[in-house]
């Protein structure tokens, strides 16, 4: 890396690439909801309520997904965007 490379402005990602990534996330989320068991929405809500007891997060900061694999087992994926600590 040369010294000039350090001072160059960094290019922001292309908006088309960003839109494509967001669309892929939405499609994957909707696909997961179709295959989820009947109890999944209630379980998801209860998990979010437990997290809110300890951390102030909005509903858009918590992602709960259930993935079915070919090996006859399920994977529950939970992503929480935690607020910055001051």
UniProtKB/Swiss-Prot annotation:
Gene Ontology biological process terms from the UniProt entry: cell division; regulation of division septum assembly
Keyword Calcium included in the entry's annotation: no
Keyword Repeat assigned: no
Regions crossing the membrane: none
InterPro entries in alphabetical order: MinE, MinE_sf
NCBIfam families, A to Z: minE (TIGR01215), PRK00296.1 (NF001422)
Family recorded in the similarity comment: Belongs to the MinE family.
Role description: Prevents the cell division inhibition by proteins MinC and MinD at internal division sites while permitting inhibition at polar sites. This ensures cell division at the proper site by restricting the formation of a division septum at the midpoint of the long axis of the cell.
Annotated protein name in UniProt: Cell division topological specificity factor
Species assigned in the record: Shewanella pealeana (strain ATCC 700345 / ANG-SQ1)
Gene that specifies this protein: minE
